[in-house]
Amino acid sequence: MAHCDFVTNSLIQNATATLHTNRGDIKVALFGNHVPKTVANFVGLAQGTKEYSTQNASGGPSGPFYDGAVFHRVIQGFMIQGGDPTGTGRGGPGYKFADEFHPELQFDKPYLLAMANAGPGTNGSQFFITVGETPHLNRRHTIFGEVTDPDSQKVVDAISTTATDGNDRPTEPVVIDSITIS
């Protein structure tokens, strides 16, 4: 078990996640050196190596958790949110974990990847990517990555301006086909 933890810790220190969506790829630099537990959770769910007790986005009990999930909430000028296997905004992996804040990570620019939650200590699988400065979220949501690639930022911007219904749900599904970690 210690060897597995070492491999995981080595991987998350400088990991990059690529969200392959039906609108294009979004490459995210993960902050494993600042928020290792949050990054390990995301990487484990993305790769299907972390246990969860609900069905994943593909409807199965195991394997990559996010494959087939949608961005279920999009608010222009604010953020795009995904990671819920049910696509409703109420789903998750069947567990919750504590917030992990780092003083160097602040919502002072766009394109930050952070955990969505329903209050302190309620992180699970849902995440969002900001499209503007959102300082009111500081110390409320764990920042664990950043979209730094200009082409990926264009994909985020395009998703953030997609047509939505009255519940901020895209009228045409924005699907996360898969996530690769490198």
From Swiss-Prot:
EC category: isomerase
Keyword Glycoprotein carried by entry: no
Keyword entries, A-Z: Cytoplasm, Isomerase, Rotamase
Domain PPIase cyclophilin-type: 13-181
Keyword Isomerase: yes
Gene Ontology molecular function: peptidyl-prolyl cis-trans isomerase activity
Any one of the GO BP annotations: protein folding
EC assignment: 5.2.1.8
SUPFAM superfamilies: Cyclophilin-like
Catalysis performed (reactions): [protein]-peptidylproline (omega=180) = [protein]-peptidylproline (omega=0)
Signal peptide: none
Primary location class: cytoplasm
Location of the region described as Disordered in the Swiss-Prot/TrEMBL record: 161-182
Subcellular location: Cytoplasm
GO CC term, one of those recorded: cytoplasm
Role played: PPIases accelerate the folding of proteins. It catalyzes the cis-trans isomerization of proline imidic peptide bonds in oligopeptides.
Protein family: Belongs to the cyclophilin-type PPIase family.
Protein name: Probable peptidyl-prolyl cis-trans isomerase A
Biological source species: Mycobacterium leprae (strain TN)
Taxonomic classification: Bacteria, Bacillati, Actinomycetota, Actinomycetes, Mycobacteriales
Gene name of the encoded protein: ppiA
